Amino acid sequence: MQVTFLGTSSGVPTRARNVSAVALRLPQRSELWLFDCGEGTQHQFLRSDLRLSQLRRVFITHMHGDHVFGLPGLLASLGLSGSSAGVDLYGPDPLDAYLHGVLRTSSTRIGYPLAVHPVRGAAESGRIVFEDDDLQVRATPLHHRVPAYAYRVDQKPRAGRFDVAKARDLNIPPGPVYAALKRGETVTLDDGRRIDGHALCGPPRRGASVVYCTDTVFCEAAVELARGADLLIHESTFSHAEAEMAFQRQHSTSTMAAQTAAEAGVSQLVLTHLSPRYAPGNAVTANDLLAEAQAIFPATVLAKDFLSIDVTPQTDPSCCNSS
């Protein structure tokens, strides 16, 4: 999996940072998932190497404008391209009314299947939000001024590595049968032998996991959702010195994000959703917030627009390669 940040500012865009949007690229299935869609997100797509035509799912954390104002336009542009097989959207209860209200009043026609799935019930009861053969998505309620949800994406365990040398020693002819054996299936060869694929594969390999957590003040629910994740993307709207304001506005400080990462035992933390007050040249900058977080959780990096991170299933804090 690969994460690309398309917007890392909170509230309003700046010259260097657009408002919230994070893309999750799934190259093994040529799909793209999007988490939040602030105003201008489709412009960020144009400036990146991401293909909007691959967009398949959108997960919205909450209904504040800096997380949703870009959604109607992006979906409309996708419709004009004529290349979408359909998009599923997940988010708070008002998402459906908001989206279809904008599309209706602007006489915008979406020429592809569009389905909206409220996540409140699943998030509050611990049920799965989405699942297929390869991936699972869960959500949990956060502590914010409006209903908000964090999301976790888990790759399911993959079959162990296939021992080609052992297969050759058993005189198993290469070809389609290898694919079945790699999946752990039992196959019958032309000579009548039955071969159990599990006997030719190593132990199952753990899949990667990504958690997207915004907007919220520190809460235990976020810790539980993020437990053991390879990558935690967490809002860091304020510095530690502004903790009182963070509590009032139900946002996180850099140290709250780091505390969540430390308690959850994640491999790497990325700070995002940064207040414009920390722009370069100000008394306190985003690099100061990074230093505050690293004092608690050293494996922390600072998000910037178009930063890409390859997420691999490891416990080593250096597991995630960024570019």
Curated annotation (Swiss-Prot):
Keywords: Endonuclease, Hydrolase, Metal-binding, Nuclease, tRNA processing, Zinc. InterPro entries: Metallo-B-lactamas, RibonucZ/Hydroxyglut_hydro, RNase_Z/BN. Gene3D superfamilies: Ribonuclease Z/Hydroxyacylglutathione hydrolase-like. HAMAP family: RNase_Z_BN. Coiled coil: none annotated. Binds 2 Zn(2+) ions. Its EC number is 3.1.26.11. SUPFAM superfamilies: Metallo-hydrolase/oxidoreductase. The active site is at D66 (proton acceptor). Its cofactor is Zn(2+). Belongs to the RNase Z family. It holds the Pfam family Lactamase_B_2. Homodimer. Zn(2+) 1 binds at H62, H64, H144, D215. Zn(2+) 2 binds at D66, H67, D215, H273. It catalyses: Endonucleolytic cleavage of RNA, removing extra 3' nucleotides from tRNA precursor, generating 3' termini of tRNAs. A 3'-hydroxy group is left at the tRNA terminus and a 5'-phosphoryl group is left at the trailer molecule. It comes from the Bacteria. This is Ribonuclease Z. GO terms for molecular function: 3'-tRNA processing endoribonuclease activity; zinc ion binding. Zinc phosphodiesterase, which displays some tRNA 3'-processing endonuclease activity. Probably involved in tRNA maturation, by removing a 3'-trailer from precursor tRNA.
